[in-house]
Curated annotation (Swiss-Prot):
This is tRNA modification GTPase MnmE. It is found in: Cytoplasm. It comes from Oceanobacillus iheyensis (strain DSM 14371 / CIP 107618 / JCM 11309 / KCTC 3954 / HTE831). Exhibits a very high intrinsic GTPase hydrolysis rate. Involved in the addition of a carboxymethylaminomethyl (cmnm) group at the wobble position (U34) of certain tRNAs, forming tRNA-cmnm(5)s(2)U34. Its cofactor is K(+). Coiled coil: none annotated. GO terms for molecular function: GTP binding; GTPase activity; metal ion binding.
Length: 459
């Protein structure tokens, strides 16, 4: 599974910029770069240094680019191989020219995520740490970045390894009892001891799963729909949160005829904000399409921001919207409180039941702090603490933790039924294997290939 050839790729985003980087990794990385580099002898310079020089096109013997070359010798590198990073001028022409010259020397173009995959296969990081690399790149808030950094640092890995070790010692103890019953110096593993150990690990997994939803929110963001009758201030709400005009705000009801999306950071919680067309019955075919799409978005949302107009009584359409969001997670926003009151607030609270109700005058920027607090408090109690918490944010990890927990509960049930110890240990071993998939110890080659294929090229 481990390729040993030298690979290369552009490691910086496509487009114009001050600097672009062509990365190489493999046993021939330094040798090949030295063949196209005019400057100091790269094979003799100290590791982890950067050298100024020029890239020479072997085909024309002309200067192709002025560069700074970083030399890093394995195993003290990300991939644990020799690594070279050619820093050239930004822009597609310059960086592609350097890449073409490197490829012409026989270096293979890297597959997506192959540098990180090599780091994993060489034991530099485990699978959960490798996945955290991509989470870090995709992080949309400081809190999400903090969670990814801690996972990259091995916080989750160390906990999983500790729990797996406890299960492994338990299984090994049982096997010694079964295979070598004559060993009097080895205490027999009783059903009570096995149940106690299984419960201890199960409880630790349960703690992780209890805050897993919060971790998933920090990683992926909340799909948040803004709903309400036309002209109640939905676009004004989005504009206030995004702090730039993404939707046209007019006095004509029904202006927003399509789905408008934007990511926003609300007190560390990433929201994928969706401004829907006003949900109402309409004869306008174009608007009706937008309304149908809005209803679908509603069903798929994690959170709904339901906007009402302080300047108008509660309408039949408003009441239908309350019916539509019944059983869903939503916050009621009473907007336009700077105008004359026509809305019965007691009636609104009766329809909202125990859901949060926030008053705003968005065009006057009033009530925004209270709204942001209500959003954060809906999913997090108080300030979001990423310092001492071990968050599980990856859906794959969450599913495996659930399976590991269930396997231990199966073992505990077997003990209650008086099943033989060698049968009970099968479920304990299953739990150990499920946790091993998180860090890659028991993951299949096909799973590993599939995970790394989701990475960006050059990472």
């Amino acid at each position: 599974m481990l390729d040993t050839d030298t690979i290369t790729a552009i490691s910086t985003p496509v487009g114009e910029g001050a600097i672009a980087i062509v990365r190489l990794s493999g046993s021939e990385a330094i040798t090949i770069t030295s063949q196209i580099f005019e400057g100091k002898n790269l094979q003799e310079v100290p590791s982890h240094t950067i050298q100024y020089g020029k890239i020479i096109d072997p085909g024309t013997n002309e200067v192709a680019e002025e560069v700074m070359v970083s030399i890093m010798r394995g195993p003290k590198t990300f991939t644990r191989e020799d690594v070279v990073e050619i820093n050239c001028h930004g822009g597609m022409v310059a960086v592609n020219r350097v890449l073409e010259i490197v490829l012409a020397k026989g270096v293979r173009l890297a597959e997506p995520g192959e540098f990180t995959k090599r780091a994993f296969l060489h034991g530099r990081i485990d699978l959960s740490q490798a996945e955290a690399v991509m989470d870090l790149i995709r992080a949309k808030t400081d809190k999400a970045m903090s969670v990814a950094l801690k996972q990259m640092d091995g916080r989750l890995s160390k906990l999983i390894q500790k729990l797996r070790q406890e299960l492994l010692e338990t299984v090994a103890h049982v096997e010694v009892n079964i295979d070598y019953p004559e060993y009097d110096d080895v205490e027999e593993m009783s059903h009570a001891m096995m149940k106690e150990k299984s419960k201890e690990v199960r409880d630790e997994l349960d703690k992780l799963l209890q805050i897993a939803q919060q971790g998933k929110i920090l990683r992926e963001g909340l799909s948040t729909a803004i709903i309400g009758r036309p002209n109640v201030g939905k676009s004004s709400l989005m504009n206030t949160l995004v702090q730039e005009n993404k939707a046209i705000v007019t006095e004509i009801p029904g202006t927003t005829r399509d789905i408008i999306e934007e990511y926003v950071n609300v007190r560390g919680v990433p929201l994928r904000l969706v401004d829907t067309a006003g949900i109402r019955e309409t004869e306008d075919i174009v608007e009706r399409i937008g309304v149908d799409r809005s209803r679908q978005v509603l069903k798929e949302s994690d959170l709904i921001l339901f906007v009402l107009n302080y300047n108008e009584p509660l309408s039949e359409d408003d009441k239908k919207l309350f019916e539509a969001v019944d059983g869903l997670e939503y916050i009621v926003i009473i907007n336009k409180t700077d105008l004359e009151q026509q809305l019965d607030l007691d009636e609104v609270r009766e329809f909202a039941k125990d859901r949060p109700v926030v008053t705003t005058a968005l065009l006057e920027e009033q009530g925004v702090d209270e709204l942001e607090k209500a959003i954060a408090d809906t999913f997090f109690t108080g300030d979001i603490d990423t310092g001492d918490m071990t968050y599980v944010s990856n859906v794959r990890h969450i599913q495996l933790l659930k399976q590991a927990k269930q396997a231990l509960e199966d073992a505990m049930e077997g003990i209650e039924l008086g099943m033989p110890m060698d049968i009970v240990q099968i479920d304990v071993t299953r739990s150990w294997e499920f946790m091993g998939e998180i860090i890659g110890d028991t993951a299949s080659d096909s799973l590993i290939d599939q995970l790394f294929s989701q990475f960006c090229l050059g990472k």
